[in-house]
UniProtKB/Swiss-Prot annotation:
Residues 1137-1159 have a biased composition (Low complexity). It holds the Pfam family TPR_19. GO terms for cellular component: Cdc73/Paf1 complex; euchromatin; nuclear speck; nucleus. Coiled coil: none annotated. Residues 1097-1128 have a biased composition (Polar residues). TPR repeats lie at residues 41-75, 129-162, 163-196, 198-231, 235-268, 306-339, 341-374, 412-444, 451-484, 497-530, 531-564, 566-598, 613-646, 647-680, 681-714, 717-750. Residues 917-929 have a biased composition (Acidic residues). The keyword Transmembrane does not apply. Disulfide bonds: none annotated. PANTHER family: RNA POLYMERASE-ASSOCIATED PROTEIN CTR9 (PTHR14027), RNA POLYMERASE-ASSOCIATED PROTEIN CTR9 HOMOLOG (PTHR14027:SF2). This is RNA polymerase-associated protein CTR9 homolog. Signal peptide: none annotated. GO terms for molecular function: SH2 domain binding. The gene is Ctr9.
C-alpha cells in the first residue's frame, strides 16, 4: 500500500483494488465496492477520514453510516475499530451542532451524537479517545460540566500528559472561575508540547486578564498572533487592552486591531459588538445598529446576543426612539447573565418614561444588587420610592438618599429629595436637608434659592409652630417668585398663588383673621376656582359661630365642584354640630355614593359616629338600640378593612363594645389605641368612662384630669362635667362642688351645670343635716346651700332645656329640697343647743386650765425662793468655813513652833502610848519621810499631785473626836476601824526639804510608816463622793457590813497592804506625801490605830481605783498649798458644809474644774458627808 493510496482486498482472491487519495471516486461507488468485497471495518474508517480531510463531509458521513451496518467485523480487535467508527461519526455531529444556529437542527445533531456515544459505551467504555470525545460533547451541552470534568480526570490519571485532557480541564477551570488552575493546565500542556496551536496561548491570555496581569496577557495574545496571524481571539484581546487604556493612541490602535479582526472574520460576534460599542461613542448610530444586528444573527451564545441587543437598545435610546429602545432593552435582559445588568438599567429608565414605577424599581433593584454602592442607581431608587405611599419603601428611599449624600455631599438634587422624604416623619431633619441644599446652591453653584424650596421651608416652620420664621420664608418665596416670573410667568405665578395661600393659613394661626381673609379673597379674584380658599373662609366663619355664613361659603365651593368631598364633609359637620343628625347623615352618604369617594374613610367614620351618637339618647326600644349598635360596628369594621391602621375606627369599635356592656374588651381596645398614639383626646375620655363604669373612680378622676391638662387647658365644660360625675360617684362631694363651680365660671348659662350644682348642694346639705356631729356653723351653711339648690331646681323646672334633662326631675328635686328645708329648723335647734353645750364645756375647761396654770406658777415661784434660800445658807456656811480655816492656820503655826522647841530639847520625853502626839497628830509630816520615798511619790500622775487650795490660805487638817454611839453607820465604822480618811490637798513637793528622820519620836515613826503605806488611799475619799453622786445613791460599804465581817476585812487589809500600795501607785496615781492619824480613846497602843488606818486605806484604795479621777476642785498649778491638820468633832458639820461648798463652787484662785465632777460633788454632798468624815 502506497502512501497516497489505499488497497481494498477482493473477496476470495489475493488481488486488491488500489484507490489513489488524489482520485477518490464518488462516495456511493466506494460504498458499493466495500460492500461487495465485504471489506473490513478499519478500511471503511480510513477511507472516511480521507474524504473528511479533503472536505468531502457528505461522503465522510455516508461511509461511516454504512460502515456501522455493513463493515466486516470478522477479524481480531474489531471492537476497537467499531468504537472508533461510532466515536468519529459522533464527534462530527458534535462539531456540526456547535456551528449550527438553528435550534431544532442543533437539537437533532446532539441527539444523534448522544445515541452514537451510548452505543460506543457498550463496546469499550474506558478507551481514552472515547472518553475524550464524550467529555468534549458534555462541555458542549453546558449543563454536564461535572461529567466532563470526571472523564478528563480519568484520562489524566491514566495518561498525565494527555494534551486534549489538559486543555479540557483548563476550559472547565476557566468556566468555574478558577483562573489560576486553568492557567496551570495550559502551562502544562505547553510544556508537554511546545508546538501547541495558538489557541493555547489565547487561553493563557484570557487567564492573565482575569488575574489582572495585563502585561502578561498582552504578551500571550501577541505570541498567539505570531503563531497564527489570523487568530481573531488574540486580535480582539489586544484591542480590548488597548481600548481600556483610554488614551487617544491606544483607542486608535484598538480600533485598528478590531478592523483587522473584522477583515479576517466579518461574522465574528465579538468583533462586531466591540466595533458597535466604538461607533456608539463616535455617535455613528446607524453603524452601531448594523454591526450589532449582524452580531446578534451570527451567534447562538446568549451572552453575545445580550450584548448585541444592548448596543441596539442604547442607540435607539439616545435617538429618543423609546419604543424600539424598550424592545431591545427587554430582549437583552432575557439573554443577559446575572452579572450583565446594564440592560436592566436602561430598561428601568424606559419604565420610568412609561410611568411604570413598580417595574422600574424592580429593574434598578437588580442593578443595585450587583453594584450595591452605585451612586446613580441609589439616587434613582430613592427618588422612585420617595413618591411611594408605602412607608417601608419611603424608609428604603431615605436610606438610599442618605448614602448618596454621604458619597456626594454636594449633590443638591439628592438633598432636596431627602428633605421631601423627611417632611412626613422628621420635620427637623427635613429643615436641615433643605438648609444644606440652600447652602450648596448659594456657595457652590452660585445660584439663587428657588421659591419652591423657600415655600417648603416656610411650611415646615409653620408645622413646627415657628410662625415668625415661617412668615419670613413665605415672604421671601413670594419675592423670589416675582423676580423669576420674567423667565416663566405662568409657572412662577402658580407658585405665588400656593405661597399666598400658605401665608393666609399662617395669618389664621396668628389670629390675624382680617389679613387671612384679605389674602383668600385676593386669590379668589385672580383664581375663582381655588376651592380651598372658599373652604377656609367658611371654616373661619364657622369658628366665629356664624354657621349660616360658613354654609354659604361651603356652597360656593360646591358650585365650582359639585362633588367636592371636603365641602360636603364640612356641611355635614355643621349639621352634626347643631345635633341635626338626619341632614348630616345624608351629606356623608352622598359622598359615599360617588364612585371616586365610595370608600372615603372620613365619611364612613362620620356615619359610624352618627349611629353611635343615637345610642346616647335615652330610648326604651331595645331592638332599635341594638340595630344602631350593629350598624355602627359594621361601618367601623369596614373602615378597618380598608385601612388597618385607622385608630379612629378602632376607637369607635371600643365605644360600641362599651355600649353593649363589654367593658373589659372595650378597655383593651382603648388601651391599644392609646399605645399607638397619645394625641387623640377621645381615647382618654373613653378610657375614663370605662373606669367609671367599672367603679374605678380614682383612676377615672386621674384620667379626666390628665385629659383636661393635655388637651383642653381646663376650659372644656363637657370634660369638667365628666370629672364632676366621677367625683360624685366616688363620694367626694366637696371636690365635685368645686369642680362644677369652676365650670360655671366658664359657662354660667349652662342649665345642665346648674342642675348638677344644685344636686351636689342638696346632697351635701342632706349629709350635713343628718350628721348629728355637725356644728352650728355647718348646719346654717347647709341650710343656706339647700335654699340655693331649691331656687335652682325651681328655676330649672320652668325654663330648663328639655333636650338635655327631664324638667319633671328638676321639679321633683325642688320638692325634695322644700321638704328638707321644712325639717331644717329642727336640725338648726339641735345644732344650736349642741353648740351652747360645747361652749359651756370649753369655758369650764379653760377655767380649770387657768387654775392649773396659776398653781404651777405658784409652785415654781416657791421652788425658786427655796433654792435661793438654800444658796444663801451655803454662802454663809462657806464664809464660816473660811473663817475657821484661818483660825486653824494660826493654830498650826503655833503648833509648829512648839514642835521645833521640843525637837531642840530631845525626843526622849515622848511616851509610847500617850502624850501630846496621841491627842493631836499632824498629817503634815512628809518632812519626816525618807528622801527616796519622796522622790518616788513625785513620779505620780499630775492629778494626784494636785492640791486643793482655799482662797488665800493653807488648809490644816482637823482633829476628829470619836462620835457617839447613836450616830449612823459611817460613824460606827469610824469607831471600830478608825476614822475614814477625808479629802486633803497634796503638799507642795518641790519647795519642802525632807527633814532628818532621826528627829522624829519613836511613836510617830510607826505612824508615819503606816501612813506612808496607805497615804494614796486617804485622798481618794473625795473620789468616793464623786462616784456616789454619779451613781445616784449613797455609798456606805462600812455601815452595810456586819460586825462579824469586820475582822476579816482588817485581816485582808493587813495582808494586802503591799498590794494596795502598788495599786494606789499604778491605778489611782502616785502616793501622796501626806497622811492622817488620829488617836483612839479606847486603845493605848499604836497598833490598833494602824490596823484601822490600813483597813480604811484598803477600802479607799479600791474606791479610788473604781473612780479613777482626781478630786474635784484640785488645782494643777497651785504649789503653795499645805496639808491641813484634822479638825475636832465640833467642827465636823462646818467642815462638811465648807467641803461641799468648796467642791461645788471652787475658790477664785483655782482652775475651773470639770463640770461633771462639780455637779457630782454638789449632788453627793449630803449623802457622802458621813463617808468622807
Amino acid at each position: 500500500m502506497s502512501r497516497g493510496s489505499i488497497e481494498i482486498p477482493l473477496r476470495d482472491t489475493d488481488e486488491v483494488i488500489e484507490l489513489d487519495f488524489d482520485q477518490l471516486p464518488e462516495g456511493d461507488e466506494v460504498i458499493s465496492i466495500l460492500k461487495q468485497e465485504h471489506t473490513q471495518l478499519h478500511i471503511w474508517i480510513a477511507l472516511a477520514l480521507e474524504y473528511y480531510k479533503q472536505g468531502k463531509t457528505e461522503e465522510f458521513v455516508k461511509l461511516l453510516e454504512a460502515a456501522r451496518i455493513d463493515g466486516n467485523l470478522d477479524y481480531r480487535d474489531h471492537e476497537k475499530d467499531q468504537m472508533t467508527c461510532l466515536d468519529t461519526l459522533a464527534a462530527y455531529y458534535v462539531q456540526q451542532a456547535r456551528k449550527e444556529k438553528n435550534k431544532d437542527n442543533k437539537k437533532d445533531l446532539i441527539t444523534q451524537a448522544t445515541l452514537l456515544y451510548t452505543m460506543a459505551d457498550k463496546i469499550i467504555m474506558y478507551d481514552q479517545n472515547h472518553l475524550l470525545g464524550r467529555a468534549c460533547f458534555c462541555l458542549l451541552e453546558g449543563d454536564k460540566m461535572d461529567q466532563a470534568d470526571a472523564q478528563f480526570h480519568f484520562v489524566l490519571n491514566q495518561s498525565p500528559n494527555n494534551i486534549p485532557a489538559l486543555l479540557g480541564k483548563a476550559c472547565i477551570s476557566f468556566n468555574k472561575k478558577d483562573y489560576r488552575g486553568a492557567l496551570a493546565y495550559y502551562k502544562k500542556a505547553l510544556r508537554t508540547n511546545p508546538g501547541c496551536p495558538a489557541e493555547v496561548r489565547l487561553g493563557m491570555g484570557h487567564c492573565f486578564v482575569k488575574l489582572n496581569k495585563l502585561e502578561k496577557a498582552r504578551l500571550a495574545f501577541s505570541r498567539a498572533l505570531e503563531l497564527n496571524s489570523k487568530c481573531v481571539g488574540a486580535l480582539v484581546g489586544l484591542a480590548v487592552l488597548e481600548l481600556n487604556n483610554k488614551e487617544a493612541d491606544s483607542i486608535k490602535n484598538g480600533v485598528q486591531l478590531l478592523s483587522r479582526a473584522y477583515t479576517i472574520d466579518p461574522s465574528n460576534p465579538m468583533v462586531l459588538n466591540h466595533l458597535a460599542n466604538h461607533f456608539f461613542f463616535k455617535k455613528d448610530y446607524s453603524k452601531v445598529q448594523h454591526l450589532a444586528l449582524h452580531a446578534f444573527h451570527n451567534t447562538e451564545v446568549e451572552a453575545m446576543q445580550a450584548e448585541s441587543c444592548y448596543q441596539l437598545a442604547r442607540s435607539f435610546h439616545v435617538q429618543e426612539d423609546y419604543d424600539q429602545a424598550f424592545q431591545y432593552y427587554y430582549q437583552a435582559t432575557q439573554f443577559a447573565s446575572s452579572s450583565f445588568v446594564l440592560p436592566f438599567f436602561g430598561l428601568g429608565q424606559m419604565y420610568i418614561y412609561r410611568g411604570d414605577k413598580e417595574n422600574a424599581s424592580q429593574c434598578f433593584e437588580k442593578v443595585l444588587k450587583a453594584y450595591p454602592n452605585n451612586y446613580e442607581t441609589m439616587k434613582i431608587l430613592g427618588s422612585l420610592y420617595a413618591a411611594s405611599e408605602d412607608q417601608e419603601k419611603r424608609d428604603i428611599a431615605k436610606g438610599h438618599l442618605k448614602k448618596v449624600t454621604e458619597q456626594y455631599p454636594d449633590d443638591v438634587e439628592a438633598w432636596i429629595e431627602l428633605a421631601q422624604i423627611l417632611e412626613q416623619t422628621d420635620i427637623q431633619g427635613a429643615l436641615s436637608a433643605y438648609g444644606t441644599a440652600t447652602r450648596i446652591l448659594q456657595e457652590k453653584v452660585q445660584a439663587d434659592v428657588p421659591p419652591e424650596i423657600l415655600n417648603n421651608v416656610g411650611a415646615l416652620h409653620f408645622r413646627l409652630g415657628n410662625l415668625g420664621e415661617a412668615k419670613k420664608y413665605f415672604l421671601a418665596s413670594l419675592d423670589r417668585a416675582k423676580a423669576e416670573a420674567e423667565h416663566d410667568e405662568h409657572y412662577y405665578n402658580a407658585i405665588s398663588v400656593t405661597t399666598s395661600y400658605n401665608l393666609a393659613r399662617l395669618y389664621e394661626a396668628m389670629c390675624e383673621f382680617h389679613e387671612a381673609e384679605k389674602l383668600y379673597k385676593n386669590i379668589l379674584r385672580e383664581h375663582p376656582n381655588y376651592v380651598d380658599c372658599y373652604l377656609r373662609l367658611g371654616a373661619m366663619a364657622r369658628d366665629k359661630g356664624n354657621f349660616y355664613e360658613a354654609s354659604d361659603w361651603f356652597k360656593e365651593a360646591l358650585q365650582i365642584n359639585q362633588d367636592h368631598p371636603d365641602a360636603w364633609s364640612l356641611i355635614g359637620n355643621l349639621h352634626l354640630a347643631k345635633q341635626e343628625w338626619g341632614p348630616g347623615q345624608k351629606k356623608f352618604e352622598r359622598i359615599l355614593k360617588q364612585p371616586a369617594t365610595q370608600s372615603d374613610t372620613y365619611s364612613m367614620l362620620a356615619l359610624g359616629n352618627v349611629w353611635l351618637q343615637t345610642l346616647h339618647q335615652p330610648t326604651r326600644d331595645r331592638e332599635k338600640e341594638k340595630r344602631h349598635q350593629d350598624r355602627a360596628l359594621a361601618i367601623y369594621k369596614q373602615v378597618l378593612r380598608n385601612d388597618a391602621k385607622n385608630l379612629y375606627a378602632a376607637n369607635g369599635i371600643g365605644a360600641v363594645l362599651a355600649h353593649k356592656g363589654y367593658f373589659r374588651e372595650a378597655r383593651d381596645v382603648f388601651a391599644q389605641v392609646r399605645e399607638a398614639t397619645a394625641d387623640i383626646s377621645d381615647v382618654w375620655l373613653n378610657l375614663a368612662h370605662i373606669y367609671v363604669e367599672q367603679k374605678q373612680y380614682i383612676s377615672a378622676v386621674q384620667m379626666y384630669e390628665n385629659c383636661l391638662r393635655k388637651f383642653y387647658k381646663h376650659q372644656n365644660t363637657e370634660v369638667v362635667l365628666y370629672l364632676a360625675r366621677a367625683l360624685f360617684k366616688c363620694g367626694k362631694l366637696q371636690e365635685c362642688k368645686q369642680t362644677l363651680l369652676k365650670a360655671r365660671h366658664v359657662a354660667p348659662s349652662d342649665t345642665v351645670l346648674m342642675f348638677n350644682v344644685a344636686l351636689v348642694l342638696q346632697r351635701l346639705a342632706t349629709s350635713v343635716l343628718k350628721d348629728e356631729k355637725s356644728n352650728l356653723k355647718e348646719v346654717l351653711n347647709a341650710v343656706k346651700e339647700l335654699e340655693l339648690a331649691h331656687r335652682y331646681f325651681s328655676y330649672l323646672s320652668k325654663v330648663g332645656d328639655k333636650m338635655r334633662f327631664d324638667l319633671a326631675l328638676a321639679a321633683s328635686e325642688a320638692r325634695q329640697c322644700s321638704d328638707l328645708l321644712s325639717q331644717a329648723q329642727y336640725h338648726v335647734a339641735r345644732a344650736r343647743k349642741q353648740d351652747e353645750e360645747e361652749r359651756e364645756l370649753r369655758a369650764k375647761q379653760e377655767q380649770e386650765k387657768e387654775l392649773l396654770r396659776q398653781k404651777l406658777l405658784k409652785e415654781q415661784e416657791e421652788k425658786r425662793l427655796r433654792e435661793k434660800e438654800e444658796q444663801k445658807k451655803l454662802l454663809e456656811q462657806r464664809a464660816q468655813y473660811v473663817e475657821k480655816t484661818k483660825n486653824i492656820l494660826m493654830f498650826t503655826g503655833e503648833t509648829e513652833a512648839t514642835k521645833e522647841k521640843k525637837r531642840g530639847g530631845g525626843g526622849g520625853r515622848r511616851s509610847k502610848k500617850g502624850g501630846e502626839f496621841d491627842e493631836f497628830v499632824n498629817d503634815d509630816t512628809d518632812d519626816d519621810l525618807p528622801v527616796s520615798k519622796k522622790k518616788k511619790r513625785r513620779k505620780g500622775s499630775g492629778s494626784e499631785q494636785e492640791g486643793e487650795e482655799e482662797e488665800g490660805g493653807e488648809r490644816k487638817k482637823k482633829r476628829r473626836r470619836r462620835p457617839p454611839k447613836g450616830e449612823e453607820g459611817s460613824e460606827e465604822e469610824e469607831t471600830e476601824n478608825g476614822p475614814k480618811p477625808k479629802k486633803r490637798r497634796p503638799p507642795r513637793a518641790e519647795k519642802k526639804k525632807a527633814p532628818k528622820p532621826e528627829r522624829l519620836p519613836p511613836s510617830m515613826k510607826g505612824k508615819i510608816k503606816s501612813k506612808a503605806i496607805i497615804s494614796s488611799s486617804d485622798d481618794s475619799s473625795d473620789e468616793d463622793k464623786l462616784k456616789i453622786a454619779d451613781e445616784g445613791h449613797p455609798r456606805n460599804s462600812n455601815s452595810d457590813s456586819d460586825d462579824d465581817e469586820r475582822p476579816n476585812r482588817r485581816a485582808s487589809s493587813e495582808s494586802d497592804s503591799d498590794d494596795n500600795q502598788n495599786k494606789s501607785g499604778s491605778e489611782a496615781g502616785s502616793p501622796r506625801r501626806s497622811g492622817r492619824q488620829e488617836s483612839d480613846e479606847d486603845s493605848d497602843s499604836d497598833q490598833p490605830s494602824r490596823k484601822r488606818r490600813r483597813s480604811g486605806s484598803e477600802q479607799s484604795d479600791n474606791e479610788s481605783v473604781q473612780s479613777g479621777r482626781s478630786p474635784s476642785g484640785a488645782s494643777e498649778n497651785e504649789n503653795d498649798s499645805r496639808p491641813a491638820s484634822p479638825s475636832a468633832e465640833s467642827d465636823h458639820e462646818s467642815e462638811q458644809g465648807s467641803d461641799n461648798e468648796g467642791s461645788g463652787q471652787g475658790s477664785g484662785n483655782e482652775s475651773e474644774p470639770e463640770g461633771s465632777n462639780n455637779e457630782a460633788s454638789d449632788r453627793g454632798s449630803e449623802h457622802g458627808s458621813d463617808d468622807s468624815d
